[in-house]
Swiss-Prot record:
Lineage: Bacteria, Bacillati, Bacillota, Bacilli, Bacillales
GN (gene name): polC
Keyword Cytoplasm among record annotations: yes
Sequence ranges assigned to domain Exonuclease in this UniProt record: 422-578
Identification of the protein by name: DNA polymerase III PolC-type
Source species of the chain: Staphylococcus aureus (strain Newman)
InterPro entries, A to Z: DNA_pol3_alpha_NTPase_dom, DNA_pol3_finger, DNA_PolC-like_N_II, DNA_PolC-type_N_I, DnaE2/DnaE/PolC, DNAPol_HHH, DnaQ, Exonuclease_RNaseT/DNA_pol3
Amino acid sequence: MAMTEQQKFKVLADQIKISNQLDAEILNSGELTRIDVSNKNRTWEFHITLPQFLAHEDYLLFINAIEQEFKDIANVTCRFTVTNGTNQDEHAIKYFGHCIDQTALSPKVKGQLKQKKLIMSGKVLKVMVSNDIERNHFDKACNGSLIKAFRNCGFDIDKIIFETNDNDQEQNLASLEAHIQEEDEQSARLATEKLEKMKAEKAKQQDNNESAVDKCQIGKPIQIENIKPIESIIEEEFKVAIEGVIFDINLKELKSGRHIVEIKVTDYTDSLVLKMFTRKNKDDLEHFKALSVGKWVRAQGRIEEDTFIRDLVMMMSDIEEIKKATKKDKAEEKRVEFHLHTAMSQMDGIPNIGAYVKQAADWGHPAIAVTDHNVVQAFPDAHAAAEKHGIKMIYGMEGMLVDDGVPIAYKPQDVVLKDATYVVFDVETTGLSNQYDKIIELAAVKVHNGEIIDKFERFSNPHERLSETIINLTHITDDMLVDAPEIEEVLTEFKEWVGDAIFVAHNASFDMGFIDTGYERLGFGPSTNGVIDTLELSRTINTEYGKHGLNFLAKKYGVELTQHHRAIYDTEATAYIFIKMVQQMKELGVLNHNEINKKLSNEDAYKRARPSHVTLIVQNQQGLKNLFKIVSASLVKYFYRTPRIPRSLLDEYREGLLVGTACDEGELFTAVMQKDQSQVEKIAKYYDFIEIQPPALYQDLIDRELIRDTETLHEIYQRLIHAGDTAGIPVIATGNAHYLFEHDGIARKILIASQPGNPLNRSTLPEAHFRTTDEMLNEFHFLGEEKAHEIVVKNTNELADRIERVVPIKDELYTPRMEGANEEIRELSYANARKLYGEDLPQIVIDRLEKELKSIIGNGFAVIYLISQRLVKKSLDDGYLVGSRGSVGSSFVATMTEITEVNPLPPHYICPNCKTSEFFNDGSVGSGFDLPDKTCETCGAPLIKEGQDIPFETFLGFKGDKVPDIDLNFSGEYQPNAHNYTKVLFGEDKVFRAGTIGTVAEKTAFGYVKGYLNDQGIHKRGAEIDRLVKGCTGVKRTTGQHPGGIIVVPDYMDIYDFTPIQYPADDQNSAWMTTHFDFHSIHDNVLKLDILGHDDPTMIRMLQDLSGIDPKTIPVDDKEVMQIFSTPESLGVTEDEILCKTGTFGVPEFGTGFVRQMLEDTKPTTFSELVQISGLSHGTDVWLGNAQELIKTGICDLSSVIGCRDDIMVYLMYAGLEPSMAFKIMESVRKGKGLTEEMIETMKENEVPDWYLDSCLKIKYMFPKAHAAAYVLMAVRIAYFKVHHPLYYYASYFTIRASDFDLITMIKDKTSIRNTVKDMYSRYMDLGKKEKDVLTVLEIMNEMAHRGYRMQPISLEKSQAFEFIIEGDTLIPPFISVPGLGENVAKRIVEARDDGPFLSKEDLNKKAGLSQKIIEYLDELGSLPNLPDKAQLSIFDM
């Protein structure tokens, strides 16, 4: 008997295992009507009829299940028919995102489209878009495919319409009013519900309700024996169990109200994405919320291919949080780590210092040190972490120690160089250590009177097999040495042959080390012969060379080097080079061996020295300041490829510091390899403690054959310990940690691999994790239990006890002193107030001044105001306006001292003649600029209109004790002058640029990870790549400087009381030094001036120069200017011509597409409304989903929504709230913290409307009104020129603000330009950044063209280098506007033109250096009319 269609559907549901997931009615009534099969295309299309829509999550589950079931047979699609689609409008919204995913749009555009609002009307689906550009693009790109996707899901849809919000005609006035009332009621309900919810939560906390979920447990318990490593998961599987630690978690609410959690976990073999939907009628959400990064979970589920991320994921059925045993330090007595590197060790250390400090505290360590490479930038965070975790912080650094001058000549002899006999020699050895390795070849030539007069060449038998490395390097084999004499015989013969000649060698310290060691073992004692090192000699007399290797010098001196790294050949080449060097020394006046070091020494000698690592530990507060001085000098005065610390510098500032021997690259470790024990002990006495590090860290030295074997390494340890015991210096075991745990080491490998020139790339990196006491004791077990305990535990604790508590950061603000600052600010404030308001000041002016001056002077801030006043005055005197940023415009004292143009008093009139004033204190007027024009009733003069109604509290806090942050916008071209003026005010050694630290960003880290995996031939899934990226992110990469921040050190202190100093990015040619600490670390300790560069003041200056109009005289309420914010009519153009409903293209703050849309929505007509828009556009969750909806629905208008942070305080005070509560509410809302229960109750008591409370609850960040007002003031002035002086405006705009030009289009007629703009709008979603920048310029050009003005081509005769110039009704572009033509070339063209006309294109190329591509562009532009390719020579030129 044949199955019915309903039975077929049930069988299908059972087969794909979702029967228990479907609603009973759907399961029983669903029908599988047919299956269309195409064997050719391997496709099956299931046609399914359902009585109602599947819930969206169930639909996705169904689709996923059916695709998985038949994936090996065919590509499956489904087409649904829904018989009862009465609620399809509700489901369309939920299915919208899925249907978008079925289109061919790019992921970015899909994401934008998913944010749009849907309205379903019958069989028509309306998608509300922001503007015409989006409407045209979406309609063209996806209309058909989107309809198909909806129909396949069962929707009965005829068409989809993309509409802008302005075309929404669905509501008539009556329904609008009803909707407004409904919104009011809904807002009231929301606020009440919020209040009740808060009360309930508070009560819940008080009752300590035990039902709250604090540990995730969903589904069945998972058997531990079923757990498998994540790395073993390589294909889809039905049921798998894993466990891992969470390193990323994302909990997302779906439109259905259900949630999906996406977790990324790792077990350090690999990583995996885990997903799970919340189940119906379960408390899964609360369990998900209990999860967080760092927690371990055990999970079980199905492994499947996720089609979106194209990777394997686990769809979890069960998950449980587990306790994972953490690494413990089980030793009874804990050690102290004295050597570790944080993320501030550039591209080398991994964790921040806080992670180390927490781990040390968890292990019970009494103290911990930080010793980053060459820097101390972790100190501020180290201090904070130590205070938090209650552990002693030891501050230090691993630096690069160099001898002040590396000698060229050793053991000076009174011998005339031209008469001397020289033995130029070279040794080949079994390794680099003269203490543990042996000479296998000794070769020399004797030189006299500039000629080689004798030769010496001997092999010696080392009685050991040569390594492959040595054989490959020297081409000497074991067979060549079998019958060679003993080294004793060779050296005895050699000593006799040398006589009293002067030794010469390239890198003589190496070769002489082997000779002297050999002589001493034979009982001869060290050589007494004079020595000359040709390597150091070349570095001194050939400073222009970047290299000084024998190969390089042989080429430079024209000497043949037959076979490098064979002693006899190296020796002969060195001899001929040296003969020429003797002549160079003669020319430099060096005639005697004992004159070489003296006459050839120079202040750059530190550059020649080979740096040794040294550990510097701060013992007390004096030591901290001395370390700051050492760090500064190494970064500023002695930087050469790396920061260097001359020994004399360390000696000068050694007080308060403990000096340690550091790692295998330290001076003492090298001495053990190269010198006898007496010399080692002599060197050891320079240090305060000796470090030895775990053998595991030195395995690389054995692998590279720098140390023979483990036994030799152990002997080196014994010699170091013996040196310490003999000298009475503590020997401590240090870990040289670069990361926390073993599994973190991969991140360091990736970072090191990203640096091709890093010497660490040459070898396998050792395990450099933060070791426990147990691990360290185990590393040194070969020393015996007692000795291991002494160096690991006893000595490290005793050394830590010798160190005092040190605080690297000050705990208060230290401002500069300026004599009479308090009196000057008071006098200046009152003097200017009387100029404006008259001798008999209004009480409101006196009250505001006294209120502010009490806070400013009482808290020591007068000097900050006075400094700002001086800077602004200097700029104004030099002809450049200054715009204020931030909240400084909230201060009336700042207004009266001319720091800002924003007047924060309530709106008011002032008579410029008789000084009569009238204030509006009731909140009825938003800005004084919006007051109607009025004449003085006393004298008839036109009244000045002022006042923005901004409370002082938004600047210095309610108590007036917050450190003022005065940000000033200087002209970009004047900014360097303002910076330099601070040196005049305070002295060059008291001002520094605010330093910044640049770390590895996520995108950069991703590139490092991918590069490393590709180089290693390793494939990792996306989740593991994400984990590795996180491990590399945040590591210091470089340093920089704040764009405008200047740090001012008070005259009674110096910079080293606060921070070391350096050049940004170690650029020794930089004009300014910066703070070594990131300026945020010392923000509360020293004054920071924000002297920023901005285009607006520069543009105002150019407009003033062109027009002769003083910008301060421009009316702020010009009606035609105000009109452009809602229509382009006052520009003499139509919306259709310029493709825009406003006239604000190119107006600062109001020219972007986002703000233009706001203008279209709000149609502002007043200055205060423009300030509102500025605030709304800069805030977060202030406009979108908040004020925008309130205005659209008519609940309130633009003037009454919350736009700027100050509006809240002013509004609430007018509503009757106490100023302190109004301030608290403003601060809470602007920081995104919402409202407390007390705040809500107080607002309700004062009849604040519910919509206002609801709006406050949504806001995440708010803009200060003073900042907005300053920006709008500048914008209105520039708009004035746009309306009334168009060509001045366009010339200034293109010169100052535009960056990318399409001159080919710009010189065309207005119709062509408009068509180009329209075409770019249609392709907007696909435009790159550069094309979008070009579009911005073309929008302005289109507007200019439709106003009757034209752009000429570049003119070889008239164009300037950088400025657009006006000629009649046209503009002539500058050379810099040509794509690809740089500043230097632009200058060169003008300079070459001044020398005479260009005769040909060839002449243009030669004189101005223009490339052929640029010349072709100028030709196409029509800029080279009648200019021949080459100059034609006529008879008359002869």
